[in-house]
Structures are given as structure tokens and as C-alpha cells.
Amino acid sequence: MSSTEAPTIIKTIEKSKSDKFECVIKILQNGLKALLISDPETEISSASLGVNIGSFSDSPDELGLAHFCEHLLFMGTEKYPSEDEYEEYLAKNGGNNNAFTKGDKTVYYFDIKNSAFEGALDRFAQFFICPKFNEGSVNREINAINSEFSKNKNIDIWRLDQLSKSELNPESPFSQFSTGNKETLSHNDIRERLLKMYNKLYTSEIMTLCIYSNMGLDTQINLVEKLFKDVPKRENFQMPKYDKVKPYDENSLNNFYKIIPVKNEEKIIFRWFFPFCENYNAKPLNFFTALFGHEGPNTITAYLKRENLITYLGTSTEDHANVFSTFDIYITLTKKGFDNYREVIKALLKYISVIKSKKINERYFNEEKNMRQIKFDFRNKKKPIDFTKKNCENLMLYKPEEVFTGKELFKEYNEKLLKNYLDMFDLNNLNICLLSKSFENECKLTEKFYGTKYSKEKLDLKKEEIDKFKYDEEKYIFDYPPENKFAPKNLEIYPNHNPEKIIKYPELIFNKENCKAYFLQDSEFNLPKGMIKLRIYFVKNLNHNSEIKNEIISHLLKKIIKLELNEILYMAEESNVEFKFKIYYDKMDISITGFNDSLKSGLKEFLTNIKNIELNIEKHKEVFLLQKEEYIKKLRNFFLQSSYKVSIDYMRKLLSTGANNHKDLLEFLLNEKLELNDLINFKNKMFLETNSVWLIQGNLLKETALEIINTTSEILELNIDTPITKSFYSKRAVNLKKNINYTYRFLNPNKDEQDSSIISVYQLGNLKNEEKQYYRILYSFLNPKFYDTLRTKETLGYIALMSQFDCLEIYHLVGIVQSSVKDPEYISGRIRNFYKEKEADIKNISEEDFNLHVKSLIIEAKRKDINLKEQFNRNWDEITLKRFKFNIKEENAEFLEKCTKEGFIKFYEEIIKKNMKRLDVEYVCQKHWEENEQKLKEEIIDCDSIKKRLVFDKISDFQDCNKLYPCFSNINYRKINQ
């Protein structure tokens, strides 16, 4: 479109039946496309802007430049020069923001309360009109990118992604390192290079904007024209061509790789390369993603799992800048599977060969097509920020009228196209990767950026071998999955029996000695869906002297039962009926969600199967031993995930009783005797003496809910009437002593990990309702400043954030930092310094700023639940905590409206400053250990409130030196065992 052409409006857009909003697409004179969505009911507005340029545009000597642009773009504009302006405006008005860079696109997005949306959108638009790329921020953001790279360096998914890129044609942009690091971005003229790239490639005609707001469409159109008309359209712009050289060649294909992963896992990854398919309405590769990833009867997953060769099989497909596509199959192997990995490879390729020999199954295609249509028509409402982010990308990929449907629906059955793509599943365009720690002596090659060790050879596999592969044809069938009996047939919305009296909150509809059930018929979301959750507390099973053993037993039992039911569970899930169960040492959670047409019959079938499963030595010994091995691997791998995630888990275990840590569980599995008979005995006793509670909610009638409760009680033989005399244990929160800095520190076993993490916890205690609101205001005030200080200004690590942690009604403020540049004790001091510096800001907060934070929290408290799931989960929390404050959001809003600046300052003085209760959880990498240990011997002199330091390396020692809080919730299913 030339700059003299009139703007265009597109009004005919395919929507879901459940979409209540209005929308249009506006194309501005400068070529920018804007999808505008008007939803009068939303309390939160959002905008996302995508630029059809990403890391593929980086030149080989400035890798990471597009990602660097994404970071630095937010650092001030000509109109709003302060680098903090955008972040501070969002923070004061309850907003959030982020961005991401892909190979061929970069997406920026935010959300905020409605009343502040125009101001935020103005600030946002300026990034694409007149950014400053603040010179003082350059080195800081290079450090931030390097921290991000360091954070990802020991995560297998990042390492594998880069290895697969590096094996492509080195002349192709698809082979490049995209994140960037200090080495690739450390040019003296990096800012000038960035400006050159921005001024050349950030042009309006390759930008897409998506807005979701309560504003009417005419208002949105005028606003977008006003704010985005000056986004420059670059003269002589030419879209980069990524297919000048072929991305893969003979050297890139038909290879077999052995790779040493970070985690102790054995995996096989199959990757096929395909030409890009422009016909997105036929979606051939998406069709085969569904088929080859299916876990129901007749499938390859069913065969491999029943033979105890794998624990997981997943499929995915990805289009790469409309140049080529890849199709991946990921398999996690058992020990047996790894020992026989060639048989696993041949079995999978044999399954594909059998499917190739058959006619494309139109029945299965139509089943997938119809199910996708039903899911789309009755989709749950998403948060505005998630919706704009997704559809901003979709606007780049699909016709404007198909922006919502292009990615989701199968519209066209094209047998010839499907057959053509099926025939391309061949050895010649396939790479196979085998991952194992056992390849230490075989992998002599090293990937440049992440240091991944691997070996490479041509795939030693012939079609004849696959053809000769034999499987027990009396026991197994290789074919398309059978027809799905769980597919919903009745999508009727049940009317409320008393429309004049709409019930807003769950009501107690079943009240027996040992069973309580709450029910709420939906009158808000109007979708043919329901959610059911049942928690069963065990009494007979609880043995205080063997909690660790019982936790292990319950985990293994859950895994074996799930494996037994895997095919039927997957068939249900394919029809959007999701059955989940978790077995703990003291309780069992059962849930079923999805289209209500199948909930009652589905739950009955699942529970009957669980009850009737007979574990026996002959049938289950092999799977028991394999699951035990898998659990040992899982526990060991826990310590190899992102450092801050390990620290967070330990924080939770330190601050409450009754949680077994991974180290103790691992030691028990390695050193103590555990047999299948232990699981059999546990299962036989599980339902002998129980206490249960239900929540049933959604498009269901009360009579149906009562039928479900009674049927379930009969199937599981729950004793709903007999009084329980035996008391059992309840979790309690740990009460930290005042003016002590507790430190729990432990060493990361991975010698290659360069990052340490610290979780710095300030315990506030049990708070009154009014105090809880001041706690939320304090978090709202400090959260963006914490990020700005420790992440942006001090560049201590890519992960630097605050969080709120409610542990059994005891409230905490939590600071989280993961860093490769400084040890945890140094960062602990910087966090103490942060609180010290912000004390003056808290005491001197202006009335205007205070009111902005309060108003944003009131809007959030009054915000309607976005979907049934959000509402259900909140109600479930109230039931399990036995608070029953189903109107908690309204209550919070009432208390917030009474909050004053003076009350806020008083809260800080009395609850925080005079009541300093602090715990640091430090997960220390090996390069930081000695320095960190030395600092732990020094006194804390930078905090007046801290008088003493106590250091621990055992959870039991830490908990033994502190008292416990009383049980604050009203729940008394379990009395404290004295």
C-alpha cells in the first residue's frame, strides 16, 4: 500500500461462538495492521505489537542484535525520556509488560487497568516512533543478555535447539546463535549498529498491532490513528530473504547424533525436514502431529508404553519463517528402552510405515476437525494480555479474516496433500538424536556456544530393517486410533431453575459425617463445561514414622495406575475431558474437567478402573522396578534444573512441616527396602477410613451433582457416615524468631553450572484482613523497584523479581535473584540495602502515588473471573482451607477502600521494621562456594534490625530451632498429633 492510499477497515472476521467481543482490522496509511477488539466487560486492557523481524536478520558478526534491540527499546523515548517512565507508569496502574524475540519476529506487549490504557498506549507507541536507545543503558543490557544466556546455558532444551541450528547450512541465517552474549555484542559501536538495524528494519508495513479494551471500536480506531500514524515507513525497505541459500543440505540430513545432556535422562528425538506448506487450512503436519502423538489404542505410544520401553512420547511441528518446516517426535526412554533403543527406533518407523501403507483415514481426520471446531466454538476466555500476544502473531501469519481460526481449525480435507506429506516421512530427511550421560567417552565434538558434547555419524538404518521389525500382532494393532466415545454430543446450556435468584457462590448440598460437597451451577460463563474436584483424606494409611516411605509408595502407585489407564485417559483428553488424580501419603485428589456431557460417565468409568486394578507380582514387577528407577532419576534431576526453582522449592519445605525434601526421598530409595507388596498394602487400605470434600461447578444440575457424589461413594466404598475417632497430622507453618538472619545454604552438584540463586524471605506472620491489603500495597509498591534496582541498574542477574508467598495463612515477601556474576551472600547484602533505601520512599510516598496503587488493587479485586477455571480454583482454595470466604474478592475490595497512607506507613513500621524475621535460601554453584562460605562467617553490619546470623544445612535442624504457628484455618479434618 502506498502512503497516499486511504486506510482500510476489515469487518468480516471469523469468530468463536463464545466470543462476545466486537472486532475489526484497521490498516493505517503507513501499512501498520491493527486488530482492534472491544469487550465492554473487561476491566483490564492490553496491547501487543509485533515486528516481522527477528534474530534471522542478525549479521554473523553481531549475533543477538535483534534480541538486544528488544531489551534496549524500552529505555526511554524522545517524548518520554526517562528510561523508567514506561515501567513506572505500568507499575502504578497495575500493569505488566514483556517482550520476546523469535527468528523472524519480535513481539512487545503489556496490560493495564482501563482508565490508564490510553496513557500506556501512548508511551508504548513512542518506542516505534522515536526511541532513545539510552547510551547509559547499553552495557547494562548487554550484561542482562549475558545473564539470560548464562541462565539458559545448562538447560537441555536450549542446548539442543542451538545444536540443531549449528548443524544446518552455516551460510543460512537459520544456523545462527540468536540470544547473543557479552562476546557477540561487545563492539565499541554496538549502539550505532543497533540504530542502523532499527532504522532500516523497524518499519510500519511489517508491524501488527492487537488491542483488547473496553473502549468502543470507533474510539479505538481514532486512538490508533492518532498514536501510531507517525510510526515510520522506511523508504526502499526490502523484507530480508531467508532462503537465499538452502537451510539444510546432505550434510545436515540422515544423521545419527549421540548427545550428553545436563539432566540424567535417556531420550530419543526424531526430526524430519519438510518443505513449507502454504495451505494452512489443510494443515498436513498438524494432522500427523495429532496422529503420531496419539496415545490411545492401536498407536505407537500404546505399544511402547505397554512394553515398558518409554515413559513419554510427544510430537510437535514448527514452520521456520515460511521457508521450511520441521516435525519432531520426542521420546523419554526407560532403562529397558535405552538398552534396546534400536528396537524403539524401528518400532516407531514401522508404525509410520504401516500408516503409509493405508489410505488416509477420513473418519479420523473429520473427528479431529470436528473436535477442533467444538473446542474453538466453546473456548475459555483468556487474559487480555495472552489474547493480544497470540493474535498479534496470528495477524502476521494468516489472512485478516482468519486471524482467530487460521491456527486453530482443520477446514479442508485434502487427501492428496496429506498423502504427499506422509510419504515424505523418510530416512533421507530424518535426523535422530540419542541423549544419555553414558556417552562421556564417545562424544568428541563440542557445540560452540553452549558447550554441548556430541558425536555425529550417518544414520545406519535401512528400510529393510524396518520392514523386518516384528511385533506381537495378536496383542497389538498398528493403525489409526478407534472412534472416540468421549466426544461430546450434547452441548446444551442448562437454564437456571430460579432465574430471579442467581446464586453466586457454592452451596453445601451434601453434608454427611465424613463427606461434604459444595455445588454451584454456572450462570456466568455459559459454556457447556464443568469442573469436579474431590479430595479424599486417608486415615488408615498415615504412619508418622514412615512419611517418607508412604510418599514414595503413593508416587509409584500413582504412576503405575496412570500407566494402566493411559489409553482411556488420553482418549478422554482428546475430547477435552481431562481426568487427573494425585495420590499423596495422606490424601488423594481426583478431578475431572471439560465438556459436561461426558463428566458423569467418564468419572464413573475412571474410578471403577482405579478401584478394580489388581496389582500383582507377576504382571507388575517389571513396571514397578522401572518406575522406581525413573523416580530416582527424577529426584536427581531436580537439582539440575534452574537454580532459582530449586531454591523456591526448598523455601516451601523450610517454612512448613510435613514436606519431605528430595534428598531424603532419594536416600530412602537408594538405601531402604521397598517392594511391590508395599504398594499393594497401601492401595488395599487407601479407602478404609476417609474424610472427603467435593466441589462441583459449571453447566451441571444439582441432581446430577448428587448422583455423581453417591455413585463415587459406592464405587470407592467411602465411609461417608461412620464417625472417625483416629486423629491425624496437620501441616504447620514455621514461626521465625525476630532479628535473626537465618541462612539455609546448599551446594549445586553440577560442576558446569555457573549460576547461584538466593531466595530472600521476610516473614510478616498471620495478618488481619486490613493488614493483608497493606501487604498487597507494599508488594505493588516494591515489586517494580526491586526489578529495576537489582536487575536493571545493578545487573545482578536476568532473574530478579519479587513475589508474595502465603504459607498456611502466614504471609511472606520474597525476593528472588539468580546470578552468575555474584555469590548469594553478596546479593543478600544488596537485598538488605534495597529495603533500607526504599524505607524513605515508603515513608514519603505521595498521596497520589499511594492512591494509584490502591485503585489498581481495587480494580484487580473487583475484576470478574476470566473463566470457569479461575473461579473454580479460587472457590476450591476457600473450601480446602475451610475459610469459605467465597466473596473474598469483594471483601478485599472493601478493605482496600478503607486503606490510608498513614495506615500503610504504620503497617510498615510495626509489621516489617520492628518485626524483622528473615530467611535466606541459597543454592550455591561450585565457583561461588568458597567465597560465599567465607562471607557467612562475617557479621551482618548493614541492617540495624538484624542482631544475629544462624546458618543451616539441614531442614530438620532449622525447624527444630523455631516454634510453629498454630493452625489458623478453620479446617479440622486432622487434629494435631501431640
What are these regions (language model features)?
Residues 2-85, 122-125, 182-185, 195-307, ...:
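His/Glu-rich zincin catalytic helix
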Residues 37, 42-68, 82-127, 158-184, ...:
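M16 family metallopeptidases and their MPP-like homologs
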Residues 145, 422, 760:
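Enzymes that process phosphate groups on RNA ends and nucleotide/triphosphate substrates
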Residues 146-152, 241-262, 363-389, 393, ...:
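Short, conserved secondary-structure transition motifs
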Residues 188-194, 674-678:
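Active-site glycine-rich loop that binds ribose-phosphate moieties when present
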